[in-house]
């Protein structure tokens, strides 16, 4: 059966049932749950240290009212980080390459930050649409520009995550295909492409981590504007 490069981005099905939900729940099963023991193992210690580091980075720009979002934002970045990294394994499906899933995460969370600002401080939230000192003739145009910029924020969040991961997966598949195809004909060139593939894989690991961090960091900055 002939497969295209984009078949890796289609959700697998078992008996007609999409397996995207189990693939989202699998990373949570791989994380060790803290026990009641006095001494934790090394993996639990590293996980706790990493969670505290992420929470500190995300909560630093927020005031005390925004700290109630700590559990949601920390859980979100851990989920995205786990899914992105597991998606780099061979023959695995990466749910975060689906724009529908990323938009399903970005749109409600962005809307929650916006509604929080409109409920708690409506004047300050609407004031972001018109910077202070704007000349009177530019007020209508600037309000339209700022409103458009506000409304495309969830789209930018979802498209950024989808595009970066999809491009990385396609590059890895293209270079790995070229490495296998060149191996019997030009072994030296195949070795060079294999080295490029190794470096690209390291880069994609960094991209997977950075994109998860950027997604949640931008949400925390949007929350900072509305608290």
Swiss-Prot record:
In terms of Pfam families, this protein maps to: ATP-synt_A (PF00119)
Show the stretches that span the lipid bilayer.
12-32, 69-89, 98-118, 139-159, 170-190, 196-216
Chemical reaction(s) catalysed: H(+)(in) = H(+)(out)
Topology class, membrane: Multi-pass membrane protein
Q: Name one GO cellular component term.
A: mitochondrial inner membrane
Q: Which GO terms describe its molecular function?
A: proton channel activity; proton-transporting ATP synthase activity, rotational mechanism
Q: Which InterPro entries match?
A: ATP_synth_F0_asu, ATP_synth_F0_asu_AS, ATP_synth_F0_asu_bact/mt, F0_ATP_A_sf
Localization per Swiss-Prot or TrEMBL: Mitochondrion inner membrane
Q: What keywords does the record list, in alphabetical order?
A: ATP synthesis, CF(0), Hydrogen ion transport, Ion transport, Membrane, Mitochondrion, Mitochondrion inner membrane, Transmembrane, Transmembrane helix, Transport
- A biological process term (GO) from this entry: proton motive force-driven ATP synthesis
Q: Which domain of life is it from?
A: Eukaryota
Function statement? Subunit a, of the mitochondrial membrane ATP synthase complex (F(1)F(0) ATP synthase or Complex V) that produces ATP from ADP in the presence of a proton gradient across the membrane which is generated by electron transport complexes of the respiratory chain. ATP synthase complex consist of a soluble F(1) head domain - the catalytic core - and a membrane F(1) domain - the membrane proton channel. These two domains are linked by a central stalk rotating inside the F(1) region and a stationary peripheral stalk.
Matching entries from NCBIfam families are given as: ATP_synt_6_or_A
The UniProt subunit note reads as follows: Component of the ATP synthase complex composed at least of ATP5F1A/subunit alpha, ATP5F1B/subunit beta, ATP5MC1/subunit c (homooctomer), MT-ATP6/subunit a, MT-ATP8/subunit 8, ATP5ME/subunit e, ATP5MF/subunit f, ATP5MG/subunit g, ATP5MK/subunit k, ATP5MJ/subunit j, ATP5F1C/subunit gamma, ATP5F1D/subunit delta, ATP5F1E/subunit epsilon, ATP5PF/subunit F6, ATP5PB/subunit b, ATP5PD/subunit d, ATP5PO/subunit OSCP.
UniProt lists the family membership as follows: Belongs to the ATPase A chain family.
What is the protein named? Answer: ATP synthase F(0) complex subunit a
């Amino acid at each position: 059966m002939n497969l295209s490069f984009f078949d890796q981005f289609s959700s697998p099905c078992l008996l007609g049932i999409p397996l995207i939900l189990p693939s989202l729940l699998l990373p949570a099963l791989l994380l060790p749950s803290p026990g009641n023991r006095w001494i934790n193992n090394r993996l639990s210690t590293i996980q706790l240290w990493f969670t505290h580091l992420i929470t500190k980075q995300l909560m630093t720009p927020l005031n005390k009212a925004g700290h109630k979002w700590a559990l949601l934002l920390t859980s979100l970045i851990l989920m995205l980080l786990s899914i992105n990294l597991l998606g780099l394994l061979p023959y695995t499906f990466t749910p975060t390459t689906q724009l529908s899933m990323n938009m399903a995460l970005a749109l409600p969370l962005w809307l929650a930050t916006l509604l929080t600002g409109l409920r708690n401080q409506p004047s300050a939230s609407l004031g972001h649409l018109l910077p202070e000192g704007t000349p009177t003739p530019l007020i209508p145009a600037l309000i339209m520009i700022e409103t458009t910029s506000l409304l495309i924020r969830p789209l930018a969040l979802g498209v950024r995550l989808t595009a970066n991961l999809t491009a990385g997966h396609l590059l890895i598949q293209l270079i790995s295909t070229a490495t296998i195809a060149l191996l019997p004909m030009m072994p030296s060139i195949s070795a060079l492409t294999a080295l490029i593939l190794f470096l690209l894989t390291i880069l994609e690991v960094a991209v997977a981590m950075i994109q998860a961090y950027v997604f949640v960091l931008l949400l925390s900055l949007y929350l900072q504007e509305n608290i």
